[in-house]
Amino acid sequence: MTPVRVAVTLGDPRGIGPEVTEAALADREIAGAASFVRVGPDALVGPDGVGAGRWTPADGAPAAGRVAGEAVRRAVAMALAGEVDAIVTAPIDKAAVHAGGWNYPGHPEMLAELAGVPRVAMLMAAERTALGGPLRVVLATTHLALRDVPAALTADLLVEQATLTADSLRALWAIPRPRIALCAVNPHASDGGLFGDEEARIVAPALRRLAEGGVDAAGPIPADTVFTRAVRGEFDAVIAPYHDVGMAAFKT
């Protein structure tokens, strides 16, 4: 059986990425799970392996950001050419990446543009959690200031993200009828409009359209309960309206 080929970008050469990559690939279980290709500055992927370079935190941010972005570009090119089957990205310094000429808020936006894919969803998946069950979270909006979220969040966006999520759950997890939860924007799903109208104005129309399209979606469900309900098996994935509400639950 041909092993899965994985490109690993080393991230910011001044940071923890190369060191973490070296430690991970030294683990026999990880190293035996796939065929890994390190992608980064030549000094870091030379004959002595990851960590052989002499980059330090004192090195300039533009230079470090430039090579970190170039590693992602190279990995995407390899994936599109069929040379690798997947990409793993080590941490980057977003400010350095910007200083290096890569004008993206983060990895998801960069990967989407380099791959030429207009419709994408950022899906975080953990097959085991502290509560036992799996948790899959999609961020409807990603790297935005919180004050910009209400303007960016639309019914069209929620329909797109939930539909992409359902398609992915069928294709990658073989779940025939995925159950999607739409997380509320406001505390207690706004308690009938007492504080905020996003649930009635944005989430409710999205739910109607999803039902018409055959997507099994429920909501709006308050953030303080929806993730626990998902881990306990009630939902296969949660659509979070903004970055931190989804990532805080996922990383906990």
Task: Please annotate each region the language model reported.
Residues 1-198, 204-252:
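Anion-binding alpha/beta catalytic cores of soluble intermediary-metabolism enzymes, centered on
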